């Protein structure tokens, strides 16, 4: 059995489908109970487990051959740094000592040490903890998810404006989450000798102006980029419902991302899904 954490999101669902299509039994860990009728429909088994319930999670891992680990995002209304580190700690504790064939960990471009830099610091700690397990480990570091732009579609349609933290002419690596999940699923099934960090981005890099151009075609009206200056990032996050702690952490993460304070991989895996094809799924 292959266990998939986060299997109801874009990445986890694609990973689960990749493994299922290859003929393996798949159990997806969810926060809520999934109806039996839905389980029969997609062929996947579902286990409603709170990832902070370390003992129950370990019991599930003990029945598995291989595990895909995706740390669930915490509610931005709380302290995301604290809550996401709690789940990382629980997941790693549940994995420790379990005789698994292989573990694949979902991470991000720019993962680096840091207390208050959002996913960059949290997922770096997850990477380090996983690599300390006595198990073959693959780490998938993904570029900026194209799906992050989906939330802007309705506003672009209504106002003709794309608000963003990203400068309009600066190029950023981006990737469709479905391509990330497909790679994760392939690595989960690959030989145990295949380990280490695997970077993935899309077929091209894009600017926020490229995103606006695609949105223009999708919503049928001109869309202009409106850049939020760095001195207003914290305020913008707070206005979107983030707690003080989460807003500061995300603002710090955004700064590291925009100013590219990380090493770009020289030879990443290239997903096949373009910006426009991916955004059409959410339009």
Protein language model features and the residues they cover:
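Aromatic "clamp/platform" in nucleotide-sugar-dependent glycosyltransferases that forms part
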Residues: 83-88
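Short secondary-structure boundary segments
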Residues: 71, 107, 260
């Amino acid at each position: 059995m292959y266990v998939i954490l986060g299997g109801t999101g874009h990445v986890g669902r694609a990973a689960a489908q990749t493994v299922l299509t290859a003929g393996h039994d798949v159990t997806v860990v969810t926060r809520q109970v999934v109806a039996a009728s839905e389980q029969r429909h997609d062929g996947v088994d579902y286990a409603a487990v709170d990832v902070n319930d370390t003992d129950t999670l370990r019991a599930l891992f003990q029945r598995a051959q291989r595990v895909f680990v995706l740390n669930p995002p915490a509610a931005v209304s709380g302290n995301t740094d604290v809550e996401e580190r709690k789940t990382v700690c629980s997941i790693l504790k549940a994995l420790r000592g379990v005789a698994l064939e292989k573990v694949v960990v979902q991470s991000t471009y720019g993962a680096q040490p840091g207390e208050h830099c959002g996913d960059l610091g949290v997922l770096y700690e997850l990477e380090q903890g996983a690599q300390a397990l006595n198990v073959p480990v693959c780490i998938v570091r993904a570029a900026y998810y194209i799906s992050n732009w989906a939330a802007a579609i309705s506003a672009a349609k209504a106002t003709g404006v794309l608000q963003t933290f990203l400068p309009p002419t600066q190029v950023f690596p981006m990737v469709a989450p479905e391509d990330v999940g497909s790679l994760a699923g392939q690595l989960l099934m690959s030989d145990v000798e295949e380990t280490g960090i695997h970077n993935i981005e899309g077929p091209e890099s894009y600017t926020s102006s490229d995103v606006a151009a695609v949105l223009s075609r999708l919503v049928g009206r001109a869309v202009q980029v409106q850049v939020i200056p760095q001195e207003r990032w914290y305020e913008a996050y707070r206005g979107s419902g983030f707690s003080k702690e989460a807003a500061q952490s995300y603002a710090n993460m955004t700064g590291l991302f925009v100013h590219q304070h990380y090493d770009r991989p020289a030879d990443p895996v290239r997903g096949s899904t373009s910006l426009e094809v991916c955004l059409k799924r959410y339009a």
